């Protein structure tokens, strides 16, 4: 393997500077408590007893919040989770969404009040009303409510929303944290993640996004025992600011059984780790935003921006089609010095909707950010001519049982690829990235729905066989996508749209079944891009760095370094890509076609 280190300027912890709220953030517990006491005292001037709520996203460590609650010296603390249904009842009532599959559940469309016993809620509501009605001394009273969905009990005078990113929730699952109101500490990570993905995060997000305007404060609980508090006004203002300028999210990295060495070498990752397989740098549903306010950093889920400012972020055309959901996903797959990914397929739209309740599917593409130059590199893509469906199914079943190895090259095309090639993978196409490649994967966001057909006879990082879904997979394969179809439709489809001395604009992707359009800009000078009422997601696939500049000065020049993913909200309208002086760059930009 020939692994060449590039520029070494990838930012692992990008911070987005927010202006205008420098005095509305606190990162010391003592300061946080003092600020909350000040807010309570202001409310006590209006009414004798104040209600302050700490409303928790599932996964927030309640013991840390109770420490803050007790420091406020309230007259009484109410925990809404005392009103929750017991674990057995919750499992029974949500069993249809959990299913008995190791990986897949069904998207839950219930609301968060279904987690609680209505009679217990009513009893606690009355207790709060009674406590509030009691005469207090001249300083006024204080009731604190703690837990998930506190607004089901009472509308707070001071509402402190305690936020947390999905990635941090997953890390806590790995360290032993159970699901919400559960005791499944030792369950497999896949089990916990499934309940989070299909149930808990859906209900919690549905509840949260209706209440942004009510937040008096936002509490960042990402780092253990290091909370950061900002005002609701500053939090909302920060999101509005980002909705009108380019931004990056904080990437995260994870090892995998097939993982490689490219990211470790080029991004300066932990050298003690065996490998890194994935980088998620463009997934708002899981990535975080680092908001730098007055020299302090507030970490919040990027999904908050999607929920709070969907029109500005996505554009009217995209919002009209997808609602408050970010439809484009960028991630990196590193097999440099690693192994093949699993052989897999994604379901068609009707299948994913009927089986899992998802409104659209995971069409995707592989852009070759880099590839080993010393040996042949390839992707497995589509079926060979004349494949016998029954025979292939029989051999896959035998391989799943461990009776034989699946002869992938007997059935699946092995397509040679090189750096900067772009192959399209509409749902229903069998595919797999080969070893010694660095892939920028561009896909629609229902990313959990990958049906593995064959995993090369290996075990996962947990020492267990990785889940195979032959039943779903065989029903999803489009058997007409053979060698000829592959070369006619999804390989070598790049077309030049514009070419001048300093600029070449190429469409590298947009199969007729896919909604994500990809344009590659090869530039040695400034180039203006019009957005057509859609969010843009971009990655600098060649070159040290480039600037994204405003056409009217509405935002400061924004630098994107090699291999970084950045997002330009639709509200920007038009922007300019500017290479470093004397350098040729390639910027790949995805949008909704």
Annotate the PLM regions:
Residues 411-424, 549-572:
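Short acidic-glycine-tyrosine-enriched beta hairpin
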Residues 325, 335-340, 347-349, 372-374, ...:
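Ligand-binding loop in jelly-roll beta-barrel domains
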Residues 380-407, 442-481, 581-593:
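Double-stranded beta-helix
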Residues 35-39, 212-390, 455-496, 502-504, ...:
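Transition-metal
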Residues 2-27, 31, 75-141:
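ATP-dependent small-molecule kinase phosphotransfer cores
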Residues 128-182:
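ATP-dependent NMP and nucleoside kinases share a basic, alpha-helical "lid"
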Residues 2-46, 64-73, 175-178, 196-261:
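NTP-dependent small-molecule kinase module
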